[in-house]
Swiss-Prot record:
Principal location: cytoplasm
PANTHER family: 3-HYDROXYACYL-[ACYL-CARRIER-PROTEIN] DEHYDRATASE (PTHR30272:SF1)
Family membership noted in the UniProt record: Belongs to the thioester dehydratase family. FabZ subfamily.
GO biological process, one term: fatty acid biosynthetic process
Annotated HAMAP family: FabZ
Reactions that this protein is recorded to catalyse: a (3R)-hydroxyacyl-[ACP] = a (2E)-enoyl-[ACP] + H2O
EC number: 4.2.1.59
Protein name, UniProt field: 3-hydroxyacyl-[acyl-carrier-protein] dehydratase FabZ
Gene name of this polypeptide: fabZ
Active site annotation, chain numbering: 47
Molecular-function GO term, any one: (3R)-hydroxyacyl-[acyl-carrier-protein] dehydratase activity
Taxonomic lineage from the root: Bacteria, Bacillati, Bacillota, Bacilli, Lactobacillales
Record function comment: Involved in unsaturated fatty acids biosynthesis. Catalyzes the dehydration of short chain beta-hydroxyacyl-ACPs and long chain saturated and unsaturated beta-hydroxyacyl-ACPs.
Native source organism of the sequence: Streptococcus mutans serotype c (strain ATCC 700610 / UA159)
């Protein structure tokens, strides 16, 4: 398990854009993390005030950060950054609302030099909320 202090060491993100609360499982190429979604998230002020829904793009950002924690926690990547280079085959299946716990899984499926491809998914209560293929570049 990786707690928030280690996540903050790995990622440059800070409030209000840090979207990973805790890592539950980690291996060489796969990670499972959570984001506890609360009504206090700043994006709910405008998306949407009468019916708060987590923006899909922020779910994908949370997945990208999850993959970033895995990559940047490795000793060989100390001091480096992970740059989000693209996403493909993104699907949104379930709305994420205040009170939900987003369980995020990212699995690295391809690496070539400083480029990595990740299959990622986010679930709420065991149901798929979003999924997609993310591409990253690792650099200084």
């Amino acid at each position: 398990m990786i707690d928030i202090s280690k996540i903050r060491e790995a990622l440059p993100h800070r409030y209000p854009i840090l979207l990973v609360d805790r890592v539950l499982e980690v291996s060489d190429d796969e990670i499972v993390a959570i984001k506890n979604v609360t009504i206090n998230e700043p994006f709910f002020n405008g998306h949407f005030p009468q019916y708060p829904v987590m923006p899909g793009v922020l779910i994908m950002e949370a997945l990208a950060q999850t993959a970033g924690v895995l990559e940047l926690s490795k000793k060989e990547n100390t001091g480096k950054l992970v740059f989000y280079a693209g996403m493909d085959k993104v699907k949104f299946k379930k709305q994420v609302v205040p009170g939900d716990q987003l369980v995020m899984t990212a699995k690295f499926v391809k690496r070539r030099g400083t480029i990595a491809v990740v299959e990622a998914k986010a679930e709420v209560d065991g149901k798929l909320a979003a999924s997609g293929t993310l591409t990253f570049a690792i650099g200084n």
